[in-house]
A protein has these predicted regions:
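Hydrophobic helical h-region of N-terminal Sec-dependent signal peptides
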Residues: 9-14
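Immediate post-signal-peptide N-terminus of mature secreted/exported proteins
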Residues: 23-64, 135-148
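Compact alpha-helical subdomains of small soluble proteins
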Residues: 62-147
Length: 148
């Protein structure tokens, strides 16, 4: 799941306010649409910048039930709400889109033995990500640090 690390969102937790999302609401949602993915692509760079500036964390985990889940702080949830999202939906799309990119890039190598934190991705979601792959990759690529 190197892609999650490319998102710049993985790492050890720094704050005790970070909590796992509810497994009943995070990945037990309908597949995302192309419109939702495009909005996610538009909002992700600002969220990544906010995460970095505020030293927050948001990343996939395996919950107590052994299922893929997502860990994010109340502050991150508040930022996402202010951007017009339901946090559970934003982080669901984040996890599924990252998993779809991993499937596209690694194919059978990852689908035969997926990492335990990797959520299931529907065929429709995989197709939507394929159609929007250049924009998604641009949104998740690390921003180069300006040289002084």
């Amino acid at each position: 799941m190197a892609l999650f690390f490319r998102l710049g969102l993985a790492g050890p937790l720094l704050l005790l306010t970070v909590r796992p999302s509810s497994a009943e609401t995070l990945y037990n949602q309908p597949p995302f649409s192309e419109k939702e993915l495009n909005q996610f692509i538009a909002d992700l760079p600002r969220f990544r910048a906010w995460i970095k500036t505020n030293k927050e964390k948001a990343h996939p985990i395996v919950n107590e039930a052994g299922e893929p889940d997502f860990l994010y702080s109340e502050n991150a949830a508040g930022y996402i709400k202010a951007a017009g999202w339901k946090p559970e939906r934003f982080f669901c799309i984040m996890g599924r889109a990252a998993a779809a990119v991993a499937i596209i890039q690694q194919g059978d190598a990852i689908t035969k033995e997926p990492p335990v934190e990797m959520p299931n991705v529907s065929d429709d979601e995989l197709d939507v990500v394929r159609r929007n792959l250049p924009g998604l990759l641009k949104a998740i690529s690390p921003t180069p640090t300006p040289k002084k």
